[in-house]
Amino acid sequence: MLILASASQARRNLLEQLSIKYAVMVSHIDEGKYNSQNVKELVQALSFAKTESVVSEYIFNCRKENKALAILGCDSLFEFDGEILGKPRNKSEAICRLEKFSSKSGILHTGHCLMYRQNLNNKVIGKSFDGIICDVVSTRINFSELSNVEITKYVETGEPINCAGGFAIDGKGAVFIKSIEGCYSNVIGLSLPWLRYALNKAGMSLWK
């Protein structure tokens, strides 16, 4: 069974799309403690911290079926003109960002961390996981020209406030995106091709 260390509904939707059996345990880390001018280093550190936080809390019954178990943590940030952007703090900031994005491009980076084990001999997974697989997947996003009216109406829906960068490719914000270069699901918050790769490397499979 896979444990998702995230409260993100978008990431849950991606796992459900694959009919993966999973549970959710929300990590409780202070993201403000993590600072780096390198966006890839930052998303990787955050995804690792989220995974490690859940691993340390997850205690299971060793008498359960002896199946591989993995914990997955992710974190996404948007890089635009040298700035690292998380979720907008308010509607005004969301509007300001989208005005800047008009007819330009940025890169959505998602850090992924999978901690896994292939036996359940110990009750505390944090003391006996078999391996860690971490990586960052990046997708370039090219925006269409956006009018002020469109931007204001979009922000009024509330959708941008919940998204890294301030837009959702799997929601109403999709109409603003001219094209992408790279993994689509990565922009949503979890690269499914990366997940397949990581699970295979961990000796697990999407098809079991």
Curated annotation (Swiss-Prot):
One Pfam short name: Maf
Cofactor field: a divalent metal cation
Gene Ontology terms describing biological process: nucleotide metabolic process
Keyword terms, alphabetized: Cytoplasm, Hydrolase, Nucleotide metabolism
UniProt cross-references to Gene3D superfamilies, sorted A to Z: 3.90.950.10
Catalytic residue positions: 75 (proton acceptor)
Reaction(s) catalysed (UniProt annotation): a ribonucleoside 5'-triphosphate + H2O = a ribonucleoside 5'-phosphate + diphosphate + H(+); a 2'-deoxyribonucleoside 5'-triphosphate + H2O = a 2'-deoxyribonucleoside 5'-phosphate + diphosphate + H(+)
Subcellular location: Cytoplasm
InterPro entries: ITPase-like_fam, Maf-like
Domain of life assignment: Bacteria
Keyword Hydrolase applies: yes
Main subcellular localisation: cytoplasm
E.C. number: 3.6.1.9
TM spans (from-to): none
UniProt enzyme class: hydrolase
Signal peptide span: none
Any single Gene Ontology cellular-component annotation: cytoplasm
MF terms (GO), sorted A to Z: nucleoside triphosphate diphosphatase activity
Stored PANTHER family: BIFUNCTIONAL DTTP/UTP PYROPHOSPHATASE/METHYLTRANSFERASE PROTEIN-RELATED, BIFUNCTIONAL DTTP_UTP PYROPHOSPHATASE_METHYLTRANSFERASE PROTEIN-RELATED
Family recorded in the similarity comment: Belongs to the Maf family.
Annotated function: Nucleoside triphosphate pyrophosphatase. May have a dual role in cell division arrest and in preventing the incorporation of modified nucleotides into cellular nucleic acids.
Name of this protein: Nucleoside triphosphate pyrophosphatase
